[in-house]
Amino acid sequence: MTEHIERPGDTPMPQPEKTLLALCPGAEFMVKYLSHAYGEQWRVITRPEEGVDVDAAVMISSTDIYDVIEGNACDEDTPVKADSPLARDEAMFADYCRRHELPCLILRAANIVGTGMTGLPMRIARGIACGMLMHISGNSATISVVHAIDVARLSVELQDAPGIYNITDGTDTTIDALINAIAHRMKDKNVGTLRPRWARWLYGRRYYGTLTRSLTFDDSRVRRVLEAEGRSTDMINVVQRLNTHQYVQDDI
């Protein structure tokens, strides 16, 4: 048997004292961001565990829940898809919080950009990597995005203000600008340009529509709450960060 001998100056590793339940359907990569935001005193679990008391809860939902494929400044009152798995998960999460007397915080994040990202940003990145994703001539479509760091930060800051919030970086970036920024992050990968007719043939009607329709979301509700609590409403500009941030090994 090996005995551990503490040396002078050894600092024992802090043990988590609290538990966060984080439901992140389709965005499980957010767990590492949440762990970083909450700190070492918190343990993050992604589903209830028997015998484990939960001290706080958050659901990282998505603006994909809304029954809309095109529009500008869609707010939290926008109708949701009747058959959306996210709507079902939100209802189950709200019921869990009610039964366990926990504040119910649901963040409907726009397209999340960060390490391990999923959804449209990852599809764009993979398309760039294999040379299949190109600009579409004349495309001026805009979308909402948000950085994973801000989503995690707000999950901490809004624990005392439970509710449902849209989360964006507030910039409503163009698809072209996001493509260029992701390409820059990937060692300045070259991205060509296609005429709409060829792009429609290459990508298919659905993905072509995603790339060419504007769909942005209003986040004024969360900004009002932050202002009322004296907190900063500044968000990371996703495109700017991708273009200028000097990434190091410890970045998440």
Regions found by a protein language model. Give the residues of each.
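Amphipathic terminal alpha-helices
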Residues: 2-12, 18-20, 229-252
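N-terminal Rossmann NAD(P)H-binding glycine-rich loop of SDR-like oxidoreductase domains
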Residues: 14, 18-39
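Substrate-positioning beta->alpha
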Residues: 22, 117-123, 136-162
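Catalytic helix-loop patch of NAD(P)-dependent Rossmann-fold dehydrogenases
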Residues: 68-106, 111-112
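NAD(P)-dependent short-chain dehydrogenase/reductase
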Residues: 100-106, 110-143
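Conserved C-terminal active-site "lid" loop/helix of NAD(P)H-dependent oxidoreductases
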Residues: 148, 174-180, 200-230, 247-249
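Non-catalytic, hydrophobic alpha-helical segments
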Residues: 148-151, 167, 178, 222, ...
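Mid/C-terminal beta-alpha module of Rossmann-like enzyme folds, strongest
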Residues: 154-207, 251-252
